[in-house]
């Protein structure tokens, strides 16, 4: 039996058990497909992104000493607690989490007022996130950072320092015209900011927002930059 944790709350708090491991749905690549009359085959243009995937769990519920209806209401409140995406973790891939939104309402089967069963489905972003990737790595001198996955990752980079500086990550060069203590560059959101202040006007990107390729990525900086996280 397995465990799921959604929006920071564990299924164990509701006496829920996942009956078996979920299936693994691979993400679909996002293509623009065009057909030219008189020409054999379609033209596929890779947009460089993937579509969402579904992740479903068959769960069994034990009401214990609680009334079944009360327990069912608790579970519904839990699954609908997030507005949009929230962290989804499970005991089958403990080193990863996903960003997921609960998408399926349904009927919880009532078994003699003492137990229940339902399939819950989440609409997930296509990527999995390594939990270790949420731990900041501080770079104070030229270094190499390893991406252990087989896919490019989109980092959140905190640049510390003052004044003007240049940051290189692999083939990506970032010029910052004015750093005031720190500045954050978010490759997922494609945004630069400091707290709630937009700083896109301070940043020049030679090759778009940086990505960490599979394997080692060299990081170096100059000017007023003192460290990078």
Explain the meaning of each model-derived region.
Residues 2-7, 86-88, 165-168, 191-194:
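Short polybasic amphipathic segments
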Residues 42-66, 114-128, 217:
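Oligomerization/assembly interface segments of phage tail-like spikes and tubes
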Residues 26, 87-128:
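Short beta-strand and beta-hairpin "edge-sheet" elements
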Residues 49-53, 80-82, 112-116, 149-151, ...:
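Solvent-exposed loop and beta-edge segments used for protein-protein assembly and interaction
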Residues 5, 60-103:
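Short, acidic/charged, Gly/Pro-enriched secondary-structure junctions
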Residues 130-229:
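Intrinsically disordered, low-complexity segments enriched in serine, threonine, and glycine
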Residues 1-52, 94-108:
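Solvent-exposed edge beta-strands and adjacent loop segments
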């Amino acid at each position: 039996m397995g465990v799921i944790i959604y929006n920071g709350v564990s299924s164990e708090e509701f006496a829920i058990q996942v009956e078996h491991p979920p299936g693994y749905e691979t993400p679909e690549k996002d293509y623009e497909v065009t057909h030219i009359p008189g020409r054999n085959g379609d033209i596929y243009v890779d947009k460089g992104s993937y579509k969402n995937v579904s992740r479903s769990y068959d769960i069994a519920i034990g009401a214990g000493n609680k009334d079944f209806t009360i327990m069912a209401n608790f579970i519904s409140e839990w699954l609908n607690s997030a507005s949009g995406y929230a962290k989804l973790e499970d005991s089958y891939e403990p080193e990863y989490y996903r960003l997921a939104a609960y998408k399926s309402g349904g009927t919880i089967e009532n078994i003699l007022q003492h137990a229940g069963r339902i399939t819950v489905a989440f609409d997930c972003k296509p990527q999995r996130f390594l939990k270790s990737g949420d731990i900041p790595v501080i770079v104070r001198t030229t270094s190499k950072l390893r991406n252990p996955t087989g896919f490019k990752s989109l980092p959140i980079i905190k640049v510390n320092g003052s004044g003007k500086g240049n940051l290189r990550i692999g083939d990506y060069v970032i010029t910052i015209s004015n750093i005031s203590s720190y500045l954050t560059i978010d490759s997922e959101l494609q945004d630069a900011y400091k707290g709630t202040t937009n700083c896109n006007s301070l940043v020049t990107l030679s090759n778009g927002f940086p990505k960490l390729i599979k394997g080692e990525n060299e990081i170096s900086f100059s000017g007023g930059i003192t460290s990078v996280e």
